[in-house]
Amino acid sequence: MTSSSESTRKGLTKIATNRLQKEFMEWQTNPPSGFKHRVSDNLQRWIIEVHGVPGTLYANETYQLQVEFPEHYPMEAPQVIFQHPAPLHPHIYSNGHICLDVLYDSWSPAMRLSSICLSILSMLSSSSVKQKPKDNDHYLKNCKHGRSPKETRWRFHDDKV
């Protein structure tokens, strides 16, 4: 287990629980366009369906995100990973890890899961190529099985795709 996985098993703080219940209710009434929450009784782990935007490389494609909320959410960012198969994208590794600054260094407690989802959809929609990251094989080789992407020291060097 990773430290991030272990922290999600500790349970949520009262602040995190209240915030997630509020976000859950918002998702029930007005989910972000292109996303659907799969019903679960686990407030800490959500499965989100991502639907590709018409007119983009990912049109008519559906992917699944696994979102794990840490015990101190929203003070800490959730862990967001594409489940297999992950989309072919220059910022999405074959193991589902996503190189997107709002999931790591640029996270703010004012953000919500819906803002992360919109960033992911924007990233997918603006891509001009379907390909793995250039360092995909190297990353997978050095990424221990089950390791949280939050343990990675990401270098955000390209925001063009």
From Swiss-Prot:
Alphabetized InterPro entries for the sequence: Ub_conjugating_enzyme, UBQ-conjugat_E2_core, UBQ-conjugating_AS, UBQ-conjugating_enzyme/RWD
Pathway: Protein modification; protein ubiquitination
Class of enzymatic activity (EC top level): transferase
CDD domains in the record: UBCc_UBE2W
GO BP terms: protein ubiquitination; response to gibberellin
The organism's place on the tree of life at top rank: Eukaryota
Induction behaviour: By biotic stresses.
Gene3D superfamilies named in the record: Ubiquitin Conjugating Enzyme (3.10.110.10)
Keyword Transferase listed: yes
PROSITE patterns attached to this UniProt entry: UBC_1 (PS00183), UBC_2 (PS50127)
EC number: 2.3.2.23
Active-site residues, Swiss-Prot/TrEMBL: 99
Short name of one Pfam family: UQ_con
Alphabetical keyword list: ATP-binding, Nucleotide-binding, Transferase, Ubl conjugation pathway
Task performed by this protein: Accepts the ubiquitin from the E1 complex and catalyzes its covalent attachment to other proteins.
Family (UniProt): Belongs to the ubiquitin-conjugating enzyme family.
Protein name: Probable ubiquitin-conjugating enzyme E2 17
Organism in which the protein naturally occurs: Arabidopsis thaliana (Mouse-ear cress)
Gene: UBC17
